[in-house]
Amino acid sequence: MRVLGIDPGSRITGYGIIEKVGNRLVHVDNGAIHTDNHKEFALRLHRIFEGLCEVIAEYRPDAMAVEQVFLAHNAQSALKLGQARGAAIVAGVNAGLPVSEYTAMQVKQAVVGYGHARKEQVQQMVKSLLNLPEIAQADASDALAVAVCHANSAGMKNILRSIR
């Protein structure tokens, strides 16, 4: 299963692609989509959407996982962040991908084993789990963590579905 993890942001949206092969997690790619702060906000959202459509077309993931974000510095930031998440989710749905959402606490729990882990602990664990030579850029590292969370959670979700 190939998973595209997303760390949404109105200025920088991080993405990370991993492949689950048996019990192993394999790093495929990661990066960030940057938007121009000087451009109209609608055009920035369009850039996020188009950038993720390109990533999806190139890497053909089986699923998308997006981090839910609850904290923002102010109401305006929260609204912009929500809109960036929406652009990312629509890119996934537009490509026919199942989209799952995870809270930061769920991601930390899945990656580190502790829901209140520090950002550095999550980054170090992502580096270790994916056998990366160095810690990825912050937004991309967060996106890889979301992908790891989904890859590890998807198996459990399938088991629970089969029980019902």
Curated annotation (Swiss-Prot):
Summary of the function given for this chain in its UniProt record: The RuvA-RuvB-RuvC complex processes Holliday junction (HJ) DNA during genetic recombination and DNA repair. Endonuclease that resolves HJ intermediates. Cleaves cruciform DNA by making single-stranded nicks across the HJ at symmetrical positions within the homologous arms, yielding a 5'-phosphate and a 3'-hydroxyl group; requires a central core of homology in the junction. The consensus cleavage sequence is 5'-(A/T)TT(C/G)-3'. Cleavage occurs on the 3'-side of the TT dinucleotide at the point of strand exchange.
Location within or outside the cell: Cytoplasm
Cofactor annotation comment: Binds 2 Mg(2+) ion per subunit.
Catalytic activity: Endonucleolytic cleavage at a junction such as a reciprocal single-stranded crossover between two homologous DNA duplexes (Holliday junction)
Coiled coil feature spans: none
EC number: 3.1.21.10
Active site: D7, E67, D139
Binding-site residues for Mg(2+) 1, renumbered to this chain: D7, D139
A Gene Ontology biological process term: DNA recombination
Organism: Geobacter metallireducens (strain ATCC 53774 / DSM 7210 / GS-15)
Gene behind the chain: ruvC
Record note on quaternary structure: Homodimer which binds Holliday junction (HJ) DNA. The HJ becomes 2-fold symmetrical on binding to RuvC with unstacked arms; it has a different conformation from HJ DNA in complex with RuvA. In the full resolvosome a probable DNA-RuvA(4)-RuvB(12)-RuvC(2) complex forms which resolves the HJ.
GO molecular function terms listed in the Swiss-Prot or TrEMBL record: crossover junction DNA endonuclease activity; DNA binding; magnesium ion binding
Top-level class of the enzyme under EC nomenclature: hydrolase
Protein's name in the database: Crossover junction endodeoxyribonuclease RuvC
GO cellular component: cytoplasm; Holliday junction resolvase complex
Cofactor or coenzyme needed: Mg(2+)
The UniProt record lists the keyword Transcription: no
Family statement drawn from the similarity comment of this UniProt entry: Belongs to the RuvC family.
UniProt keyword Transcription present: no
Positions with a binding annotation for Mg(2+) 2: E67
InterPro entries referenced in this protein's UniProt entry, alphabetically: RNaseH-like_sf, RNaseH_sf, X-over_junc_endoDNase_Mg_BS, X-over_junc_endoDNase_RuvC
Keywords for this protein: Cytoplasm, DNA damage, DNA recombination, DNA repair, DNA-binding, Endonuclease, Hydrolase, Magnesium, Metal-binding, Nuclease
Pfam families in alphabetical order: RuvC
CDD domains linked to this entry: RuvC
